[in-house]
């Protein structure tokens, strides 16, 4: 079977990670060979970069530094883990990818979507997912979910203002409109079962070539 690459995006607290975990189980039950991974991280070097980026103590980090660190982690992750898995015929489910950088650093940080895209084009050399699912939710609801989740570790980006998180969402919606051939938007405020059904439908359409 031909390998596939799917990425999943959303503001903090959209339930993205929960959906990906459920999707992984669903696909495995169907007999697919699945790799679940995340960004920043996924491989040792990228995980070390992740610890630097998300450390709550690093409040002085410049936006461009942040963007470059994400791109560096992404490059290593792609070469070391994602591409080999796709070549081996696996279905790769990635919790965040390029679009996170476009929304967070490009739009919310005000560095420019095109500028951040250019940095990432250099990092990934044109290797985009075949499909990206963006889980959309009001940031206020998302942050309330995070605060209720006692098991989730609070990172540096969680500590940003509510207005920043609204900018992130606005950035995502602009990106989804611009790259509508690759990105689909799912309303994550709907019941979990409904969101999951839409997620499965979108992924299976790609896998089965519908």
Swiss-Prot record:
Would the keyword Aminoacyl-tRNA synthetase be found if you checked this record's keyword annotation? Answer: no
**Organism domain of life:** Bacteria
Show the GO MF annotations.
ATP binding; dTMP kinase activity
Under the heading InterPro entries, the entry gives: P-loop_NTPase, Thymidylate_kin-like_dom, Thymidylate_kin_CS, Thymidylate_kinase
Q: Which residues bind ATP?
A: 10-17
**What UniProt keywords apply to this chain's record, in alphabetical order?**
ATP-binding, Kinase, Nucleotide biosynthesis, Nucleotide-binding, Transferase
- For this chain's UniProt record, which GO biological process terms are given? dTDP biosynthetic process; dTTP biosynthetic process; dUDP biosynthetic process
Which Pfam families does this one have?
Answer: Thymidylate_kin
Q: Which reaction does it catalyse?
A: dTMP + ATP = dTDP + ADP
**Enzyme Commission code(s) on record:** 2.7.4.9
What are the record's GO terms for cellular component?
cytosol
Question: What is the role of the protein in this entry?
Answer: Phosphorylation of dTMP to form dTDP in both de novo and salvage pathways of dTTP synthesis.
Q: Which family does it belong to?
A: Belongs to the thymidylate kinase family.
What HAMAP family does the annotation carry? Thymidylate_kinase (MF_00165)
Q: PANTHER family given for it?
A: THYMIDYLATE KINASE, UMP-CMP KINASE 2, MITOCHONDRIAL
Record-given protein name? Thymidylate kinase
């Amino acid at each position: 079977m031909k390998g596939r690459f799917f990425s999943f995006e959303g503001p903090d607290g959209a339930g993205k990670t929960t959906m990906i975990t459920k999707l992984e189980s669903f696909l495995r039950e169907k007999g697919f060979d699945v790799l679940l991974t995340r960004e920043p991280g996924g491989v040792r070097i990228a995980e070390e970069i992740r610890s630097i980026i998300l450390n709550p103590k690093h409040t002085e980090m410049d936006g461009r530094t942040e963007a470059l660190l994400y791109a560096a982690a992404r490059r290593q992750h792609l070469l070391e883990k994602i591409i080999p898995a796709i070549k081996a015929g696996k279905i790769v489910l990635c919790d965040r990818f390029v679009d996170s950088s476009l929304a967070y650093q490009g739009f919310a940080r005000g560095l420019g979507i095109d500028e951040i895209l250019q940095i990432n084009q250099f990092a990934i050399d044109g290797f985009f997912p075949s499909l990206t699912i963006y889980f959309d939710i009001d940031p206020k609801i998302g942050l309330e979910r995070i605060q209720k989740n006692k098991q989730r570790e609070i990172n540096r980006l969680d500590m940003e203002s509510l207005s920043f998180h609204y900018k992130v969402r606005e950035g995502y919606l602009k990106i989804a409109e611009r790259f509508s051939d690759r990105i689909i938007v799912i309303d994550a405020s709907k019941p979990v079962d409904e969101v999951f059904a839409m997620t499965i439908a979108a992924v299976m359409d790609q896998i089965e070539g519908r």
